[in-house]
């Protein structure tokens, strides 16, 4: 019976570590993406140039603000959903 108890405790500890690690990794990834968004001003300027638009600073800043607003709305919606 003692061996069975040890095996059960090891399995429970592994499952708890897996679940905990998943949540910690998810939070760290969300924080990283919030601090370092994949699309920055330089990327937006480059995309506008490739589409044939002249990337004025006002247009670039408008797109950046829209993206930030959408990210905040999506984050708020996700928190509300929980």
UniProtKB/Swiss-Prot annotation:
Subcellular localization: Membrane
Transmembrane regions listed in the UniProt entry: 4-24
Topology relative to the membrane: Single-pass membrane protein
Keywords: Membrane, Transmembrane, Transmembrane helix
Gene Ontology CC entries for this record: plasma membrane
Main location: membrane
Signal peptide: none
InterPro entries: UPF0154
Top-level taxon: Bacteria
Pfam families assigned: UPF0154
Family membership noted in the UniProt record: Belongs to the UPF0154 family.
HAMAP family hit by this protein: UPF0154
Protein name: UPF0154 protein SMU_1719c
């Amino acid at each position: 019976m003692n061996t069975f108890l040890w095996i059960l405790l090891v399995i429970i500890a592994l499952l708890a570590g897996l679940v905990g690690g998943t949540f910690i990794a998810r939070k760290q990834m969300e924080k990283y993406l919030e601090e370092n968004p994949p699309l920055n001003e330089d990327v937006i300027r480059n995309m506008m140039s490739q589409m044939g638009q002249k990337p004025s600073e006002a247009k670039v800043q408008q797109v950046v603000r829209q993206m930030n607003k959408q990210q905040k709305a999506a984050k708020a919606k996700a928190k509300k959903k929980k």
